[in-house]
């Protein structure tokens, strides 16, 4: 039987989540990929896997998703966003004194609550696996470096590291490993000009590739 992996935030064709899904598929995994929009159906068809539309900030939707999965070996928590690539979150990109309560809560929901919900409801399944794996996609912003006007995003991504450390200790008795990946700026199809400027800050003169 093939191992089964669940990858969140895999709807963007040039994003990290979809790249991870492609790599897992190439390595023999059965997959469930999720996004908040219908474009996940297109990505799923491209890979020949199952795609589900789900808002991972809502516990009831996550619980329903996990009830529809019989076995699960790997969870990749990739859902989330920075305000610099989302016009819907422009008011998050401010100094802390200017961030509204609504923007603060929305940023933590998208970048922290999504990982909490998906991990919490997937644990009963992963604990049954012979080699369960949980991966959090964090960021260099927050845990390793500062970025101006990103207090919400940085806080959420740093908090993921604390979640990883705690989970790793708690779930070791089930043979589950828990790790975080902290990428820098990764090239996507969201803001080419911003990616070019970010690339100027690196030795190779370009952004990372998914």
What role is predicted for each listed range?
Residues 2-31:
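Canonical Rossmann dinucleotide-binding motif of NAD(H)/NADP(H)-dependent dehydrogenases/reductases
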Residues 2-3, 71-72, 126-139, 173-176:
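Active-site loop of short-chain dehydrogenase/reductase
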Residues 82-105, 148-152, 190-192:
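Conserved mid-core segment of classical short-chain dehydrogenase/reductases
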Residues 106-128, 168-169, 173:
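Amphipathic alpha-helical dimer-interface segment in Rossmann-like NAD(P)H-dependent oxidoreductases
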Residues 9-13, 99-101, 133-159, 164-173, ...:
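Catalytic loop of short-chain dehydrogenase/reductase
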Residues 89-93, 173, 180-210:
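A glycine/serine/threonine-rich, flexible loop-to-helix segment
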Residues 7-9, 77-78, 132-139, 177-182, ...:
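Structural signature of the Rossmann-like NAD(P)-dependent dehydrogenase/reductase core
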Residues 81, 93-116, 135, 160:
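Catalytic Tyr-X3-Lys loop
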């Amino acid at each position: 039987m093939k191992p089964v992996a669940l990858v969140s935030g895999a709807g963007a064709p040039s994003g990290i989540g979809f790249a991870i899904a492609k790599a897992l598929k190439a390595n023999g995994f059965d997959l469930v990929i999720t996004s908040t929009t219908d474009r996940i159906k297109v990505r799923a068809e491209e890979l020949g896997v199952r795609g589900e539309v789900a808002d991972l900030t809502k516990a009831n939707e996550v619980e329903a998703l996990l009830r529809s999965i019989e076995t699960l070996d790997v969870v990749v928590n990739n859902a989330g966003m920075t305000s610099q690539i989302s016009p819907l979150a422009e008011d998050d990109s401010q100094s802390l004194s200017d961030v509204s309560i609504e923007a603060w809560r929305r940023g933590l929901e998208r970048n922290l609550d999504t990982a909490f919900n998906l991990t919490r409801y997937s644990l009963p399944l992963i604990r049954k696996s012979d080699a369960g794996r949980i991966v959090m996609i964090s960021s260099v912003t927050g845990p390793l470096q500062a970025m101006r006007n990103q207090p919400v995003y940085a806080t959420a991504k740093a908090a993921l590291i604390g979640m990883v450390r705690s989970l790793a200790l708690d779930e070791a008795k089930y043979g589950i490993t828990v790790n975080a990946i902290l990428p820098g700026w990764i090239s996507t199809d969201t803001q080419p000009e911003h990616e070019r400027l970010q690339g100027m800050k690196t030795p190779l003169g370009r952004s990372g590739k998914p």
